[in-house]
UniProtKB/Swiss-Prot annotation:
Any matching Pfam family: OTCace
Keyword Cytoplasm: yes
Protein name as catalogued: Ornithine carbamoyltransferase
Annotated metabolic or biological route of this protein: Amino-acid biosynthesis; L-arginine biosynthesis; L-arginine from L-ornithine and carbamoyl phosphate: step 1/3
Record family assignment: Belongs to the aspartate/ornithine carbamoyltransferase superfamily. OTCase family.
Domain of life of the native organism: Bacteria
Main location: cytoplasm
GO CC field: cytoplasm
GO terms for MF: amino acid binding; ornithine carbamoyltransferase activity
EC number: 2.1.3.3
Residue numbers binding carbamoyl phosphate: S52, T53, R54, T55, Q79, R103, H130, P131, C132, Q133, C261, L262, R289
Functional summary from the UniProt entry: Reversibly catalyzes the transfer of the carbamoyl group from carbamoyl phosphate (CP) to the N(epsilon) atom of ornithine (ORN) to produce L-citrulline.
Length: 302
């Protein structure tokens, strides 16, 4: 039976932890120059309605390193951009490729694509979730902190797809998470409610320094996500003070690490000084998109 990677809570804790183990193994093999062609002869179709640097490069390179091939398709270059129903696209693509990664706006659209496809679907990002990124983040924490489930995590900024994904992660892995957002910019209510039912240890605040106090991991994202450019000025005013900077770091654990999914708007949600500090592991984090996604693709498509 085919399996998809749409949202963390669709998978079991054991399955998610197996991805970390496989990613670490594939990363070690890549660093050692050992071939690991687990997807030889396989093709990944990559559907993009949102532009990207890290998502496209990491999936394309990942398929190459796994011995397969990746096919880039933008919405403007396919019939989806002209109104072809998702259920038709899913069934047609299922006859051509062995898996689909989609980066788009609507989570419902991704779930519909998965419903009608007979091949694995990977959520490369929606406005609701970014599961590949949060798994890369946690792989990075594991590399730097080891006992990642015993740490306190802090999210500062917008209650966006990354915040939603971190709440899902807290529900699945059981760690403590504090989410600090301005009033009116909280995470999605359905995500909050589901995490509560799953027993997640998540605290929601409007004070970033209180959220950061003693935290082992500080994390943030841009104040205005793709598609929200017209709200930039309004959001800049609302998010003033919700920044990772020297004061935030001083409030956290002395050995804290800083995460950011990138691209960063330096001196907005995070200062240039902070992102260049010894606490920041953002480029390890960016690299780990490659390794965790290879593990996801190998698990679903091998």
């Amino acid at each position: 039976m085919k399996k998809d990677f749409l949202c963390l809570t669709d998978w079991s804790l054991e399955e998610l932890e197996n991805l970390f183990t496989l990613a670490a193994d594939l990363k070690a093999k890549q660093k050692a120059g050992e071939q690991h062609h687990l997807l030889k002869g396989k093709t990944l179709g990559m559907l993009f309605e949102k532009s990207s640097t890290r998502t496209r490069v990491s999936f394309e390179v990942g398929m190459y390193q796994l011995g397969g091939h990746a096919l880039f398709l933008s919405s403007g270059s396919t019939q989806m951009g002209r109104g072809e129903p998702i259920k038709d696209t899913g069934r047609v693509m299922s006859r051509y490729v062995d898996g689909i990664m989609i980066r788009t706006f609507s989570q419902e659209g991704v779930e519909e694509l998965a419903q009608w496809s007979t091949i694995p679907i990977i959520n490369g990002l929606t406005d609701m979730y970014h599961p590949c990124q949060v798994m890369a983040d946690l792989l990075t924490v594991i590399e730097h902190k080891k006992n990642y489930r015993d740490l306190t995590y802090c999210w500062i900024g917008d209650g966006n797809n990354m915040a939603n994904s971190w709440i899902n992660a807290a529900a699945m892995f059981g760690f403590e998470l504090r989410v600090a957002t301005p009033k009116g910019y909280e995470p999605h209510a359905l995500v909050v409610e589901r995490a509560k039912k799953l027993g997640a240890r998540v605290t929601y605040l409007n004070d970033p320094l209180e959220a950061a106090r003693g935290a082992h991991v500080l994390n943030t994202d841009v104040w205005a996500s793709m598609g929200q450019e017209e709200e930039q000025a309004k959001r800049a005013a609302a998010f003033a003070g919700f920044q990772i900077n020297a004061e935030t770091i001083a409030a956290a654990d002395p050995a804290c690490i800083l995460l950011h999914c990138l691209p960063a708007h330096r001196d907005e949600e995070i200062t240039d000084e902070a992102i260049e500090s010894s606490h920041a592991v953002v480029f390890d984090e960016a690299e780990n998109r490659l390794h965790i996604q290879k593990a996801i693709m190998a698990t679903l498509m091998a």
